[in-house]
Amino acid sequence: MKRILSIVAISSLPFVSQADTYSVSDKFYVGLGAGIISPNDVDIDISAAGTVNGVTFSGGITGEFEFDNGYQINGLLGYRINDYLSFETELGYTKFDYDKVNLTVGGTATSGGVTFTGAASTSYDIDGSISAFSMIFGPILDFDVYENFELLLGGGIGFASYNDEIKSVGGSTGLSYDEDSTDFAAKFKTGANYSFTEQTYLQATYGFNYINSGVDNFTDDFTAHSFNANLVFNF
């Protein structure tokens, strides 16, 4: 995906206007927006019996967690180095629900004296959710295409502080927990800016999000796709 987006950006360069777009007329900018997040499945691989998040698992369990789409609210604070390069801090609040767990190899999970037994090749509905606050900092490149339209490409690193709560699985509280964590996060994004005035423009972006949230002998890291629209002001 990154290679394809890079090729698209490079191939657009011959058509880049030499005149500044409205959106690069001032150094500082702030933005506020919202969008949706589409989490990827998270693999489960519990090779040995153990306890994670206060839940005791039997060994040999494999499967995946599935999630519903959720929402994001985000803010931007940036500074333009020149006509094409900015450095930006993105603050975000994200929330989405668990959908279900798909077990490939079953086993047991015990929490609070209650044991959940999951069968192989079976799916169970989950009552639970994840909410997160994130901060990402990094460079943004933008390329003028028309007088008030430009493409952007960027990314950054930072952290995500999140609450991960499962209330029940398949109606059982045997796999229930409520944990707070803070982990390394990164984001790649691309999109476009459309200027309304010299101080105001609309930004639409696609983002690929990564959180180093994997737990040894339990789950892999978290990744997700996001689609956002922001109203941005220069000053």
Tell what function each PLM region has.
Residues 37-73, 178-182:
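Surface-exposed strand-loop-strand hairpins of Gram-negative outer-membrane beta-barrel proteins
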Residues 44, 165-172, 214-217:
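Short acidic, glycine/proline-rich loop/turn micro-motifs
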Residues 184, 191-193, 200-209, 225-235:
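Outer membrane beta-barrel transmembrane domains
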